[in-house]
Amino acid sequence: PDGTTVLKEIDFSLDKGQTLGIIGATGSGKSTIVRLLLRLYDPTNGQIRINGRDIRSLDPAELHQYFGIVLQKDVLFADTIEKNIDFGRRFSKEQIEEAAARAQAKEFIQQLPQQLAYELHARGSNLSGGQKQRVLLSRALAGEPQILVLDDSASALDYQTDAKLRQVLKQQFADTTTILIAQRIGSIQHADKILVLENGRMSGFGDHATLLATNTIYQEIYHGQTGGRINA
């Protein structure tokens, strides 16, 4: 936005239904990719295509219909859980409940007084971090998006819940292309493809095993987070 080039020489493609993990140090350009996808700003060079179409040729409303997104700074507003998930889209209660179940939010919602009618405080301050993330995930999944973008949005989930969520995405959203932006390799190592960013450039692109064997940046992140342990 200020004239500084944030990303350079980024070139990759994804097939429908594939999962892409994006990892890199803070400031490497991970979240900029999301902003470009949503056309919060456009690339100065090159193109971004969805189904073969340059996204600059799409009406903004049409473009946004492709996506279900959970960003780091997404907020919950002071209203019921149901309305926070619905987000003005007029889904049926059954659709809301299904989205909550898929996002692993059903169990904790059922334990709340009034359940889906439970009133949240501003920013969801009366929920835990993991609960807030699951409500936001419910919002994203409710629209059954063609492209799901999760920007470090499962960081507060425990391992078991994260694993269940991955299984749901694999089984029930098999045709949805998923982009996972994460700080932890454990959150993306199961992705079909992983994009490694360093200072706005593509340092590596491949699956976990390939990058672990060939990419120095990925190896450094991995060993720094695991102490060198090999986690399948």
Model regions and ranges:
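ABC-type nucleotide-binding domain
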Residues: 1-232
